[in-house]
Amino acid sequence: MDTRRAFAIAACLALAACGGSGGGGGGTTGGGTGGTTTPPPPPAYTDSNTYSSGGSSSLASPNEITAVTKHSLVIGANTLNYTATVGHLTAMTLANPTPEASFFYIAYTLDGASPGTRPVTFFYNGGPGSATVWLHLGSFGPKRLATNAPSTTTPTPFAFVDNTESLLDVSDLVFVDAVGTGFSEAIAPNLNRTFWGTDVDAQVFRDFVMRYVAVNGRASSPKFLFGESYGTPRSSILVNLLESAGTQMTGVVLQSSILNYNSNCGVFDTVTISCYAYVPSYAAVGAWLGLVTPPQPVAQLPAYMALMRPYASNVYDPAVRAWMAGTAPSGTIVTQLAADTGMSAGNWSAHFNMDPGYFHDNLVPGSVIGFYDGRMVAQRGTPLAADDDPSSTFYNDSFSSTIVSYLSNDLHYTTPSTYTISSNAINVWDFSHAGLQFPDTVPDLAAAIAQNPKLEVFSANGYHDLVTPFYNTEGDLARLGAPNANISVHFYEGGHMTYLDDVGRQQEKAELAAFYASTASTKVAEAAVPAAPSQPFAETPRPTGTMPAAAFEMKLRDPMLPPSLRGLKPTPPSTGDALRAEVEQRLQSLFDSARPKRAGLVTLEEARAAGLGYIANNFQAIDTRGAGAVSFDDVKRFMRARGATTLPN
């Protein structure tokens, strides 16, 4: 066996956290005050492990060998020299650390910056069952595919260009694939499907983030999560778990959210809830396509949406509820909806509680529009309409071919395995969470803020997204109180992947940079300094092997439910005292996970053994009586004293 690999496996299985080269997690290169020196990388190698996305698959012998390369990027007046680190890192259980899963990741770290103060952001897509190729190659990494959205005539494959809107000038970037996607796989005796559920998925992501932080000396770094689509409920649960485990986070970016499956009418086949929150998005799409009356210029879109929000809530929604009870809508409402959205009055009369699938099929006769981006249109019978969503089909080939060539040619990582862009995990996914059959993660986000009142949330939304409509997200977040000092909500031209639109991406980058700079714990961080000059460095040589083409195991539609669940009935969202009780329940369940020997009391040792770092790190302050054990009421009092406002009195 290769001695490097043998060492990596031994380190992986024996240590919960290590600081050596086995982790390979992207330490910075010398040249900056407080910076560390990355040891020379190993020689060129092809990762000979065979990775599988199958539900019954698992990895017998993980390794943590990495490919390390040097690059530069010009943003504005600054040239940023950075290190790319590609490979696997093992997530360990909190209690009695044992290997769970081997996560495939790509980290980009700024040369010369101090890891103690430099922000680090963890990116992931959703699905569930989607690899992070979309955020990695489309959003704020150092390179991106130039898609020119919403055009459907841009030559493909798209040009792969330096990304002048990258977030690398404000944060180190870690793109990580979920278990059973990309090259990430469970470690035996676990199986991939062991982690295919709302709760277990968030738990194993927690363990990856904590391991990465420990291996790479990032405990004091400002830390951010950046999840898209299903990645947003993952983020809400994950940030609560991280805070409870004692890993304090600085911020969460929610890209195109579905925080509560139960509030999104587009998730279900049997529409038992009002689709009112989609109406502003319908109007935005109709306006872009020139179908509304009177016409609405693109520059006036925010003002148009400001009119459509109250109309959807105060006029359309009550009419839908009356329609569900048997009262036909008035002709006035139907006529106004037709003018506002471009959908015919006849279609509104026939399908008054209009779901996005019907809108997608019927807005443009003879054509389909995109779900991910309603501005994209394809005539039925053409290749672009073959998978029923031109805003997915048009991008798939370029993203799938580029990830393979980029990994091998630029980042010097190869494996004989197939990179899985979308697995079939969703067909067996356990969506239940906190007693509900479909996740409502607004209470989890509130519980995280209760533990860390300084946590800040950035919600990014596309006006033309027909999968996770922006007004639905506004309603979900409004349950936490509006205005809420912890939460900022932002809107952009574009669809689900706002960053594919050049205008939307530039605006989002500017607002994200301001968000990072304004967060309390990053004000002293090296957030926007140019990199130090690149130091002499022996890169991992480019391997001679080639990789198979990337694969889609199923048609991409994120977020969604499998057919077996789409006919079930959602649960109405909680508000007020009921919501606060749910927040308390989330925190109580974490407290109870310590399984205290004395009912209702947890000792310092029990908190540590259970991985409850929040309690362990603050134990003396929580234990005001000096009893050597604390109750959940003691923990709540401590949270309130630190500014928590989402807990019951």
Which residues does each predicted region cover?
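A catalytic-pocket lid/entrance helix-loop region that shapes and gates access to the active site
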Residues: P142-A146, N240-D340
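C-terminal motif of bacterial Sec signal peptides marking the signal peptidase cleavage site
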Residues: A14-A17
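Alpha/beta-hydrolase fold nucleophile elbow
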Residues: G217-Y230
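Catalytic histidine-centered segment of alpha/beta-hydrolase-like enzymes
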Residues: G495-R505
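N-terminal cap/lid subdomain of alpha/beta-hydrolase-fold enzymes
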Residues: P42-G54, P97-T194, A478
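Alpha/beta-hydrolase fold catalytic core
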Residues: A322-V467, R479
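Acidic Ca2+-chelating loop motifs
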Residues: P596-R608, R625-K636
